[in-house]
């Protein structure tokens, strides 16, 4: 991740919203450069670390929270659960998300695992921890990213604009108090193969999110993926 000012790396709305933690973002950049210089490296690539914040803050209407990036080199691309279009096969958690997408919406299975069209629709795909050491899941937890992403979530809530949060798994569920009573939430177990059969399948998160958005007076999301 480059040492450029935050305003050059993210959407202007997000640059303002993350102003209180700009110094923390700088510290995280220093941490990542140390990871590289030590030979440990990090994922996703530097240009994609803040990718979730390059889409307009003002447009966000659904928040989907992930834990941390995929640790497999070539998979993480800066949006939670998403992978680059050329990744085959898709990670199993994403495959389960696609199974539920098909069941819930009656749409065909997407051709690839790139969820960028959702981001362009105002769906924020945010990992609580924005980086990971290759091959080492959760290796950057507690290093400081949580300060940044919790500031982001508070900024979303403070807008007083329609917002629905989709919380998959225990880690995401701990954010519910931060969202407050005004943000409707859709909760289930994580789509991981270890838990998906215990309540993720059949939870209909996509159609339910649209029902809640309409109830808030907002436009529903067009969830279709190519």
Curated annotation (Swiss-Prot):
Taxonomically, the superkingdom here is Bacteria
Return the EC number: 3.2.2.27
Q: Which residues form a coiled coil?
A: none
Predominantly, its location class is cytoplasm
**Subcellular locations according to the entry:** Cytoplasm
Matching entries from SUPFAM superfamilies are given as: Uracil-DNA glycosylase-like
Keywords on this record?
Answer: Cytoplasm, DNA damage, DNA repair, Hydrolase
Which residues constitute the catalytic centre?
68
Say what the protein does.
Excises uracil residues from the DNA which can arise as a result of misincorporation of dUMP residues by DNA polymerase or due to deamination of cytosine.
Question: What protein family is recorded?
Answer: Belongs to the uracil-DNA glycosylase (UDG) superfamily. UNG family.
Name used for this protein in its record = Uracil-DNA glycosylase
Mind giving the lineage of the organism this protein is from?
Bacteria, Bacillati, Actinomycetota, Actinomycetes, Mycobacteriales
């Amino acid at each position: 991740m480059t040492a450029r000012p935050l305003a050059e790396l993210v959407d202007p709305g997000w640059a303002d919203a993350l102003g209180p933690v700009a110094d923390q973002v700088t510290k995280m950049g220093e941490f990542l450069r140390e990871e590289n210089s030590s030979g440990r490296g990090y994922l996703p690539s530097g240009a994609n670390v803040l990718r979730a914040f390059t889409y307009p803050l003002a447009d966000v209407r659904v928040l989907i929270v992930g834990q941390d990036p995929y640790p497999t080199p070539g998979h993480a691309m800066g949006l939670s659960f998403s992978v680059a279009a050329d990744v085959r096969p898709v990670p199993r958690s994403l495959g389960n998300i696609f199974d539920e997408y098909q069941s819930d919406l009656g749409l065909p299975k997407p051709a690839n695992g790139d969820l960028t069209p959702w981001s362009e629709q105002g769906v924020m795909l945010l990992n609580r921890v924005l980086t990971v050491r290759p091959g080492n899941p959760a290796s950057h937890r507690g290093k400081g990213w949580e300060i940044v992403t919790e500031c982001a979530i508070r900024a979303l809530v403070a807008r007083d604009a329609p917002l629905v949060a989709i919380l998959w798994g225990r880690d995401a569920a701990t954010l519910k108090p931060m969202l407050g009573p005004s943000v409707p939430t859709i909760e289930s177990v994580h789509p991981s193969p270890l838990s998906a059969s215990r309540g993720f399948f059949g939870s209909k998160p996509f159609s339910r999110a649209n029902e809640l958005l309409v109830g808030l007076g907002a436009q529903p999301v067009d969830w279709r993926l190519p």
